[in-house]
Design a protein with these regions (language model features):
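Rossmann-like NAD(P) dinucleotide-binding subdomain of oxidoreductase/dehydrogenase enzymes
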Residues: 3, 7, 12-84
Length: 84
């Protein structure tokens, strides 16, 4: 259901924010560089958001391609992330 999907996306964001706070040291951690994520059609917001959050938390730039069945969900997710 949609509420569970949004909750899972928020959980991913909280998790990776905690990882940055607890485990990354800018003096020793170096980003890998640009990463590409292709998300599946199931869990279109949660998995898409989790992939982006993981890459950004590690300092990488992201090129994310949503599933062809769910482009509007991904577009709205990106808009919300940019607003945040």
């Amino acid at each position: 259901n949609a509420i569970a999907e949004v909750r899972e996306a928020v959980d991913f964001l909280h998790y990776y924010a905690g990882q940055v706070r607890d485990d990354f040291d800018n003096e020793t951690h170096r980003p890998l560089g640009p990463v590409v994520w292709i998300s599946p059609w199931n869990f279109p917001l949660a998995i898409f958001t989790g992939q982006i959050a993981a890459a950004l938390a590690a300092g990488n730039s992201v090129l994310a391609k949503p599933a062809e069945q769910t482009p509007l969900i991904a577009a709205q997710g990106v808009a919300i992330l940019l607003e945040a």
